[in-house]
């Protein structure tokens, strides 16, 4: 088991932000169904990327890996051989997108994944695909992985629940490639910036669609062509380094590099949100300058940057006033129930924090070193690491191998910036630290 041992320390200097997971996975998928050769530069090399590559190879795409470059020759037929078993690993995007893609033309395709992936909702997507003609068979009565699916999709209309943007994003892929016209309406759409990211890819590849309010129509039979694409930095990952920079003792701004300020990624909102709370942040070409600065708490709508909930919760512990994070119901259905996970772990550190039905209430409070657990969630692990850097006393964070999902060199990046983090392999032990639990009832009455 990989564990981080974190000693209180401040960060200084500059950081190179890893490439976007969301763009990397979409680029690989579209290149794999395109006609001709595609070149993807600066891709994120991670377990989710490997899961997407393996699935696309099973579909018949030729994928060659070079240092920071993928060369892909697509299979525009987009047909999986009958009885293919797709392993989505621990990737929600691979699970949802490949399920939709396999339903377009293929038959008797089975998808499976990690035990953790089984808790991710699928019913809204599967029901929409049924409305387009797909069929599903489950190996158990629980409607969980693994399951077997068959297409093809027919011209039809469906609505789809909008609680998770990946449902609509997966449908957009399927409806673009299906033989005939298809349309769907998103009911109560959430996480809108991430669906907009999927639409951006359709526009980049000149794949037609039209929209009216929350209804999207696709003529079908679209044929994407090969393309070149340079993956920019991941704003979701940048948020963790930015948080460390805001809390830093540095007298100079900390530069976050490899970021495209014009990119459409959802968690870019994190930076303007922190500016609105008083943080000092500036933009300079492909860099963001974060000045160590104080900031207030506030009422924060999380819908546009749902993946930033764990690190924003940590920052709220250091704010000058209380905070209410709301409209984050979908955070319960990520790699962990992030609302409960971050509450449980930060309470171990002394945080005054209380979960609500769709978010969190946080009162500023000092944090103390503790023995913590990531809940096998990369964003929880990274958020706790930043909290531990600015806590009083050492901390241990167990189950941190999950960080490779989006930020493979997370510890190395922070240590270059003078953080004191040690990676070690151990089991839970009698190792002790100064732990305090300050429960929310004392502060929230």
Curated annotation (Swiss-Prot):
The keyword Cell membrane does not apply. Keywords: Amino-acid biosynthesis, Aromatic amino acid biosynthesis, Cytoplasm, Transferase. It catalyses: 3-phosphoshikimate + phosphoenolpyruvate = 5-O-(1-carboxyvinyl)-3-phosphoshikimate + phosphate. Its EC number is 2.5.1.19. CDD domains: EPSP_synthase. Phosphoenolpyruvate binds at residues 21, 92, 120, 166, 338, 379, 405. Belongs to the EPSP synthase family. Monomer. This is 3-phosphoshikimate 1-carboxyvinyltransferase. It comes from Chlamydia pneumoniae.
């Amino acid at each position: 088991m990989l564990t981080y041992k974190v000693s209180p320390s401040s960060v200084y200097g500059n950081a190179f932000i890893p490439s976007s997971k969301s763009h990397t996975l979409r680029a690989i998928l579209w290149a794999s169904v395109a006609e001709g050769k595609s070149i993807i530069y600066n891709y994120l090399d991670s377990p989710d990327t490997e899961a997407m590559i393996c699935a696309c190879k099973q579909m018949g795409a030729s994928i060659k890996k070079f240092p920071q470059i993928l060369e892909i020759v697509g299979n525009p037929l987009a047909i999986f051989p009958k009885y293919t078993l797709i392993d989505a690993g621990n990737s929600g995007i691979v699970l949802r997108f490949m399920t939709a893609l396999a339903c377009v033309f293929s038959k008797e395709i089975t998808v499976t994944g990690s035990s953790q992936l089984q808790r991710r909702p699928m019913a809204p997507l599967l029901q929409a695909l049924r409305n387009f003609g797909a069929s599903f068979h489950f190996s158990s009565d629980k409607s969980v992985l693994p399951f077997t699916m068959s297409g093809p999709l027919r011209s039809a209309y469906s609505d789809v629940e909008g609680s998770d943007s990946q449902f609509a994003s997966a449908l957009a892929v399927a409806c673009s490639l299906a033989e005939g016209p298809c349309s769907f309406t998103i009911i109560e759409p959430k996480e809108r910036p991430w669906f907009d990211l999927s639409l951006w890819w359709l526009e980049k590849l000149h794949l037609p669609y039209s929209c009216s309010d929350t209804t999207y129509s696709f003529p079908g039979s679209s044929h994407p062509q090969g393309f070149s694409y340079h993956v920019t930095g991941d704003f979701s990952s940048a948020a963790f380094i930015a948080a460390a920079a805001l809390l830093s003792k540095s007298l100079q701004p900390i530069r976050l590099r490899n970021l495209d300020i014009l990119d459409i990624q959802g968690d870019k909102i994190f930076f303007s949100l922190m500016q609105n709370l008083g943080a000092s942040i500036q933009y300079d070409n492909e860099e963001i300058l974060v000045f160590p600065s104080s900031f207030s708490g506030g009422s924060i709508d999380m819908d546009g940057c749902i993946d930033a909930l764990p690190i924003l919760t940590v920052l709220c512990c250091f704010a000058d006033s209380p905070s209410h994070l709301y409209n984050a119901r979908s955070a319960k259905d990520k790699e962990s129930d992030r609302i409960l996970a971050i509450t449980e772990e930060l309470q171990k550190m002394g945080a005054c924090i209380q979960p609500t039905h769709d978010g969190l209430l946080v009162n500023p409070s000092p944090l103390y070193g503790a023995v913590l657990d990531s809940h096998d969630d990369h964003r929880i692990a990274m958020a706790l690491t930043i909290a531990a850097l600015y806590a009083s006393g050492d901390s241990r964070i167990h189950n941190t191998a999950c960080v490779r999902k989006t930020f493979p060199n997370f510890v190395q990046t922070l240590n270059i910036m003078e953080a004191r983090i040690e990676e070690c392999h151990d089991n839970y032990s009698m190792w002790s630290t100064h732990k305090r639990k300050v429960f929310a009832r004392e502060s929230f009455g």
